[in-house]
Amino acid sequence: MSANHMTPDEIVAELDKFIIGQNRAKRAVAVALRNRWRRQQVAEPLRHEIHPKNILMIGPTGVGKTEIARRLAKLANAPFIKIEATKFTEVGYVGRDVDTIIRDLTEYSIKQTRELEMRRVRSHAEDAAEDRILDALVPPPRGASGEPERGEDNSARQTFRKRLREGKIDDLEIEIEIAQPMPQMDVMTPPGMEEMAEQLRGMFAGLARDKKKSKKIKVREAFKLIVEEEAAKRVNEDDLRAAAITNVEQNGIVFLDEIDKIAARQETGGADVSRQGVQRDLLPLVEGTTVNTRYGMVRTDHILFIASGAFHLARPSDLIPELQGRFPIRVELDSLSAEDFVSILSETDASLIKQYTALLGTEDVKLEFTDDGIRRLAELAFSVNERTENIGARRLYTVMEKLLEELSFDASANSGEVITIDAAYVDLQLAETAGSQDLARYVL
């Protein structure tokens, strides 16, 4: 079933495979995604007036804020960009201005749409690539005009086609004409002059277009290059750009991380270099404006913005009132417990345990984690979080890496062995480090 047609229940169930707990946040993003589908069912002109309800996630680091947004975008197959709010400065200061968010999102959508189109025409491109390679191996007869005549394959050509498909001539060298790749030209222009930059790029690209070079390469490499070339010929660039821009405008998701860092705190004195300025620059983007990109104008009216922050030193009310109003849905995420850590390690798809088991399995080392080993690992990670900085589930990465450090280093020497990770093994490897506050702070 397409993600666009999934009900909120189904979306939450899909997110549950990767993220433990945080049901309120999952429900909020599931409804936001479902509302996009609902909006598409509404007739114009009312459809245009329905705007997405942006979400503000509040919670400490490592509890799943970013992962929820990333998994949602993957589920919806939507253009998605994660950016740090602290990377941007007010227009007029040295640094990136907020319009680059939409430009980067559009670049991502172009890439995503191009990959989709290339897959769609790939079978035709492969047929054309086969013919071009066979032309180099068994040239077809030429007509009176000197052009190759296409007809039924002769027996030699049929034999080579069969061997090509079976991979029996992959290492054979052939001489073939390959299109020269266009030089990567990046024209630097001031904000607002992207159209001029695009014209310059087009001019330089036009100089290099249709240039071919004869190369002597193996059939395997030639096939890949020609398939790419033939697929690119079959993709209409104008249609691709139009589809990509529509995809950004209707389905784009922007994840604004660390938004609490640009909130001006009451007790802070000094110039506050452009904190409020960045917030004011974000306002039109979130509210709905038109941004000029190298591919055309992009409207942001229906792009979904998800902001997140720990809000340890600032409060959501420290954001300027206008920006607060642009994020009507607020969700607080809970800190993770030791029980949550157990679930993260054992229940999620692509859990850390599955990842490390697969990695060491490539060297024929079999890892077996017992229930008490997993629980002890979770308890130690939770304990270190309690006594030092609480970095949430990210602590599991450092603890797991330390646990398997020696085993990973000596994996080739342990080939064919079965290693059982139980509570005793975890204590042997980690108890001393986790027990000492100083060591835990700097090692874990």
From Swiss-Prot:
<dbReference type="GO" id="GO:0016887">
    <property type="term" value="F:ATP hydrolysis activity"/>
</dbReference>
<dbReference type="GO" id="GO:0051603">
    <property type="term" value="P:proteolysis involved in protein catabolic process"/>
</dbReference>
<dbReference type="GO" id="GO:0043335">
    <property type="term" value="P:protein unfolding"/>
</dbReference>
<feature type="binding site">
    <location>
        <begin position="62"/>
        <end position="67"/>
    </location>
    <ligand>
        <name>ATP</name>
    </ligand>
</feature>
<dbReference type="GO" id="GO:0036402">
    <property type="term" value="F:proteasome-activating activity"/>
</dbReference>
<dbReference type="InterPro" id="IPR027417">
    <property type="entry name" value="P-loop_NTPase"/>
</dbReference>
<feature type="binding site">
    <location>
        <position position="20"/>
    </location>
    <ligand>
        <name>ATP</name>
    </ligand>
</feature>
<dbReference type="GO" id="GO:0009376">
    <property type="term" value="C:HslUV protease complex"/>
</dbReference>
<dbReference type="Pfam" id="PF00004">
    <property type="entry name" value="AAA"/>
</dbReference>
<keyword id="KW-0963">Cytoplasm</keyword>
<feature type="region of interest" description="Disordered">
    <location>
        <begin position="130"/>
        <end position="158"/>
    </location>
</feature>
<comment type="function">
    <text>ATPase subunit of a proteasome-like degradation complex; this subunit has chaperone activity. The binding of ATP and its subsequent hydrolysis by HslU are essential for unfolding of protein substrates subsequently hydrolyzed by HslV. HslU recognizes the N-terminal part of its protein substrates and unfolds these before they are guided to HslV for hydrolysis.</text>
</comment>
<dbReference type="Pfam" id="PF07724">
    <property type="entry name" value="AAA_2"/>
</dbReference>
<comment type="similarity">
    <text>Belongs to the ClpX chaperone family. HslU subfamily.</text>
</comment>
<feature type="binding site">
    <location>
        <position position="322"/>
    </location>
    <ligand>
        <name>ATP</name>
    </ligand>
</feature>
<keyword id="KW-0547">Nucleotide-binding</keyword>
<comment type="subunit">
    <text>A double ring-shaped homohexamer of HslV is capped on each side by a ring-shaped HslU homohexamer. The assembly of the HslU/HslV complex is dependent on binding of ATP.</text>
</comment>
<dbReference type="GO" id="GO:0008233">
    <property type="term" value="F:peptidase activity"/>
</dbReference>
<dbReference type="InterPro" id="IPR003959">
    <property type="entry name" value="ATPase_AAA_core"/>
</dbReference>
<feature type="binding site">
    <location>
        <position position="394"/>
    </location>
    <ligand>
        <name>ATP</name>
    </ligand>
</feature>
<dbReference type="InterPro" id="IPR019489">
    <property type="entry name" value="Clp_ATPase_C"/>
</dbReference>
<feature type="binding site">
    <location>
        <position position="257"/>
    </location>
    <ligand>
        <name>ATP</name>
    </ligand>
</feature>
<dbReference type="InterPro" id="IPR003593">
    <property type="entry name" value="AAA+_ATPase"/>
</dbReference>
<keyword id="KW-0067">ATP-binding</keyword>
<dbReference type="InterPro" id="IPR050052">
    <property type="entry name" value="ATP-dep_Clp_protease_ClpX"/>
</dbReference>
<keyword id="KW-0143">Chaperone</keyword>
<dbReference type="InterPro" id="IPR004491">
    <property type="entry name" value="HslU"/>
</dbReference>
<dbReference type="GO" id="GO:0005524">
    <property type="term" value="F:ATP binding"/>
</dbReference>
<protein>
    <recommendedName>
        <fullName>ATP-dependent protease ATPase subunit HslU</fullName>
    </recommendedName>
</protein>
